[in-house]
Curated annotation (Swiss-Prot):
NCBIfam families in the cross-refs: rplD_bact
Protein role: One of the primary rRNA binding proteins, this protein initially binds near the 5'-end of the 23S rRNA. It is important during the early stages of 50S assembly. It makes multiple contacts with different domains of the 23S rRNA in the assembled 50S subunit and ribosome.
Family matches, as SUPFAM superfamilies: Ribosomal protein L4
Keyword entries, A-Z: Ribonucleoprotein, Ribosomal protein, RNA-binding, rRNA-binding
GO terms assigned for molecular function: rRNA binding; structural constituent of ribosome
The protein, known as: Large ribosomal subunit protein uL4
Highest taxon in the source lineage: Bacteria
Gene: rplD
Species for this entry: Methylobacterium nodulans (strain LMG 21967 / CNCM I-2342 / ORS 2060)
Amino acid sequence: MKFEITTLDGADAGSVELDEAIFGLEPRADLLQRCVRWQLAKRQAGTHKVKTRSEISRTTKKMYKQKGTGNARHGAASAPQFRGGARAFGPVVRSHAHDLPKKVRALALRHALSAKAKDASLIVVDDVRLEDGKTKALKECFGKLGLSNALIIGGTEVDENFGRAARNLPSIDVLPVQGINVYDILRRDKLVLTRAAVDALEARFK
């Protein structure tokens, strides 16, 4: 499908033919949900931990004799039912990551790109370069493009001045094309791709 290209200043810069197999699919929410869940689970630290009966600092002596007191039978005070006792079936340090087939991840990325194109939330620019790393100048450019909450995907390397200027803008993320992912695409209102990023994505899914 034909798509207009613009410059950072909002001027017309021609057009590009987008591959329907990447940008023209009917988005599937189930694939997007699976991929986002996989990404967030993989990112989770999993450092939660509580102490078991073998780990807490408490005596293992029997609280009182077995018979004759009229009270219930108990062993050590480290049992979970007592104040200061251990935790039963508590969290342990573990990885929350789970597997997701590579083909499913690739398909989910294409559906995420298609979702932005379908919602008219996709912008293609010729390049993202600045002469200096001034945030004020970049903010003016984004104002012309109507960008306040966006993910910007550059080529294999992001221009240093552009990255420095965008770093100070809230709700603006900048990634090289090899770092593009479903979660970051969906969490921002707009997706901005450079011409180099479009070419790289089409080569990747060829």
